[in-house]
Amino acid sequence: MKYIVKATSPLNSYEWMNSPSKKALVLMSGGVDSSAAALLLMKENYSLAGMTMEITHSGSSSAVLSASSVCKELGIPHFSVNISEEFNRKVILPFCTSYSRGLTPNPCADCNEKIKFGVLWDAAEELLGNNFSVATGHYARIIKKEERHYLAKGANKAKDQSYFLSGISAQKIPRILFPLGDFRSKEETRGLVRSSGLAVSERPESMEICFADEEGYRAMISGDQKPGPIRDTSGKVLGDHKGIGGYTLGQRKGLGIASKHPLFVISIIPEENTVVVASRAEAFRSEVTAGSVNILAPEYLKEGLFLFGKIRSQGE
């Protein structure tokens, strides 16, 4: 597929593409983290270029402008790629349809796997070849052990984003750089950018889904949502919900039903349009079923191996 790539800040773009020195393409959002990643790589004498994805939503154009501005300040080329069609198909549509199936989507993980390290990676190679590393401002690490490269947690436990990166192809990991992996706080990152004099240093951190705020994403999934019963494990109806898309497994708050003891969502049954709740003791499970498994270190999988699983980004 041919991608529409714009040289938004064409400074030294020809020289970068033909540079014999070690090169890195920084996927930039125009925020503090990706700008800090670029600064750190410049200190390591990488020849840099920036690339930003352009998608049709309210924040996309400002991200491109901000990233382009940062690249101009750094004196490096910047490219933008319009991937609206792919983003809608690979991230937004699955996000919306998951709720109607009683599932809780993870759009950030989908975006990392299918867009940043998928579509954007392919667009970069189509334009620039493959003799460069790809860097982002994620708080995670790539470690090398016995000639193999592995995805690892970032040093900052609260900011660690390895959970959202676990879908990346193992074949791509050797070419990936996470310069912020050893940073232990957001203030440390912001301090680096501030000391460099970049105007982006005071840009606020975004905590929302990039393509919709809380109200917006509720509106996106409300079209096929219908009221239905909330019941307990005995079948007793305790109340009503406004649509199964507003609930997720393990949820306790916002159920809208009165009870002497805390109740948790333990099951969502789409075909019955039903939400099932139970006590904390009943909410635990001894078995889980994993889907879309991506094995990054198959050599460690051995019979009898004891493993830990992680079901949300801030879980253990």
Please describe what each predicted stretch is.
Residues A7-S13, M17-S21, A135-E316:
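AMP-forming adenylation/ATP pyrophosphatase catalytic core
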Residues M1-G167, S185-E188, L192-R194, V265:
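ATP-dependent adenylation/nucleotidyltransferase module used to activate substrates
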